[in-house]
């Protein structure tokens, strides 16, 4: 190695190291895996609207669809590639030349294009779904990437069901993919089977034993079948993964994918724990984008959904309400404004306390001074009503005061 090449080698390693250690990249698959949510079907204009919202959010990569799946998917990817700027546009393809060519054709007008090639690599999938041997899978990966190389800006390779695969074989497949031109290696927990520490251990093993991995970014794609998609994604980041595949509101097959809002706000809120990893996401867009996706897909956001649910910043317990009025940090680890929500909601109900009730009276314009005895009387009437009704509205409070 001459001196010039040695300098280039160090620059290359330093560049990859920066990508691997300091920044987490976000790959949104709402328009592909998210659309696989049962009952969801998006038209091309709706997909374009969501894609533009993802750009405003600051998403690095938008997986626009699976062009070989249907003419509609091809049209959607092609339209997004042509009209949406500011993010890498990605298309999914199975490991065969026909799928790959469809994806390449759909992406041709993209500002920056990524081909996402996948094939199953677990023994279960290879035997019962693919009916292929390990060697046949290795040969297929090699030949397909040779066909695709140079026809798009970048290639991502996914080993479907990698989390349940033999790790040494997974490393071998990933090494072949990197040698063939893949610069992003995705490790899916396809069926949401992993435990966080277990998944982190697998990511570390892949990082240490995959040939050429220093020239690639490790990505993860976690499903939520056991409610662990966010925990597994964060554990993988701790272990060295630097791309997370996610969806808005956690949409996706079966129990869904990890919600981007959960991963990002975990990293932001606990930046001390994650050593200030760089996250280039405008979190104030979350609530607006969540509502847009919910409206267009017809999938309601559960009220108790972390970050974007309607109850995420709502407080009914009297003890909590008193704490919130004293200092919001007593019961909120982030502000509603930080995710684009309007404000904290103090909800009056049977669990509410006297402090919250008195504060609400003032908010309703009852500025006259009530005696302690009168406030106690009004509060007793409120509690009696709250025991009988699920919701106590402002009109109910006014009626109590003026009766």
Residue ranges and their predicted role:
Residues 4, 13-96, 345-348, 352, ...:
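N-terminal capping/small domains of soluble enzymes
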Residues 23-24, 30, 265-267, 272-403:
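A mid-to-C-terminal "edge-of-domain" accessory segment
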Residues 26-29, 62-64, 87-93, 113-117, ...:
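Hydrophobic faces of well-ordered beta-strands that scaffold small-molecule active sites
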Residues 32, 67-69, 92-96, 118-122, ...:
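Active-site beta-loop-alpha junctions enriched in small/polar residues
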Residues 42-59, 82, 97-213, 234-239:
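Alpha/beta enzyme core
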Residues 194-197, 201-322:
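Catalytic alpha/beta core domains of metabolic enzymes, predominantly
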């Amino acid at each position: 190695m001459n001196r010039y090449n040695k300098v280039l080698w160090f620059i290359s390693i330093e560049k990859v190291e920066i990508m691997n250690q300091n920044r987490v990249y976000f790959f949104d698959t709402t328009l592909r895996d998210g659309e696989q949510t049962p009952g969801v079907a998006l038209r091309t204009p709706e997909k374009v609207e969501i894609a533009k919202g993802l750009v405003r959010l600051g998403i690095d990569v938008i997986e626009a669809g699976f062009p070989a799946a249907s003419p509609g998917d091809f049209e959607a990817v092609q339209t997004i590639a042509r009209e949406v700027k500011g993010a890498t546009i990605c298309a999914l393809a199975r490991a065969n030349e026909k799928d790959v060519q469809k994806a390449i054709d759909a992406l041709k007008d993209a500002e920056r294009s990524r081909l996402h090639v996948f094939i199953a690599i677990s023994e279960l999938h290879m035997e019962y779904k693919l009916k292929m041997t390990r060697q046949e899978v290795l040969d297929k990966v090699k030949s397909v990437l040779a066909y695709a190389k140079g026809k798009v800006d970048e290639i991502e390779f996914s080993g479907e069901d990698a989390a349940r695969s033999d790790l040494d074989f997974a490393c071998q497949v990933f090494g072949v993919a990197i040698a063939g031109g893949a610069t992003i290696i995705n490790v899916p927990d396809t069926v949401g089977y992993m435990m966080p520490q277990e998944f982190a251990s697998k990511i570390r093993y892949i990082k240490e034993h995959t040939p050429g991995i220093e020239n690639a970014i490790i990505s993860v794609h976690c499903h939520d079948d056991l409610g662990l998609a966010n925990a597994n994604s964060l554990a993988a980041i701790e272990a060295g993964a630097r791309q997370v595949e996610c969806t808005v509101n956690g949409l996706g097959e079966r129990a869904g994918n990890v919600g981007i809002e959960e991963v990002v706000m975990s990293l932001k809120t606990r930046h001390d724990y994650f050593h200030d990893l760089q996250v280039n996401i405008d979190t104030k867009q979350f609530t607006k984008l969540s509502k847009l996706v919910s409206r267009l897909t017809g999938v309601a956001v559960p009220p108790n959904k972390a970050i974007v649910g309607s109850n995420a910043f709502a407080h009914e317990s009297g003890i909590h309400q008193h704490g919130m009025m004293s200092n919001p940090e007593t019961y909120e680890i982030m502000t509603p404004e930080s995710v684009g929500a309007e404000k904290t909601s103090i909800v009056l109900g049977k669990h509410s306390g006297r402090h919250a009730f008195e504060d609400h009276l003032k908010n309703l314009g009852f500025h006259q001074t009530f005696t302690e005895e009168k406030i106690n009387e009004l509060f007793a009437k409120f509690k009696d009503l709250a025991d009988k009704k699920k919701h106590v509205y402002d009109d109910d409070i006014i009626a109590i005061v003026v009766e």
